[in-house]
Curated annotation (Swiss-Prot):
The lineage of its organism: Viruses, Riboviria, Orthornavirae, Pisuviricota, Pisoniviricetes. This is Non-structural protein 3b. InterPro entries: IBV_3B. Pfam families: IBV_3B.
Length: 64
């Protein structure tokens, strides 16, 4: 026979752990916002990772 009390208790523990994990993820995201345009640039239909600030000197011609 299934022990429903144990199943419910285990489920509650899992829900608490998931809730804690989501709160942690939320706090990390709110303090460390990731801006992809700080590390990459969109050119010619592709995203390119920037090696340094010199890579984004702005002397490239914009072509659609």
């Amino acid at each position: 026979m299934l022990d429903f009390a144990a199943i419910i208790e285990t489920g509650q523990q899992i829900i608490q752990q998931i809730s804690f994990n989501l709160q942690h993820i939320s706090s990390v995201l709110s303090t460390e916002l990731f801006d992809p345009f700080e590390v990459c640039v969109y050119r010619g239909g592709n995203y390119w990772e920037l090696e340094s600030a010199d890579d984004c000197s702005g002397d490239d011609e914009f072509i659609e």
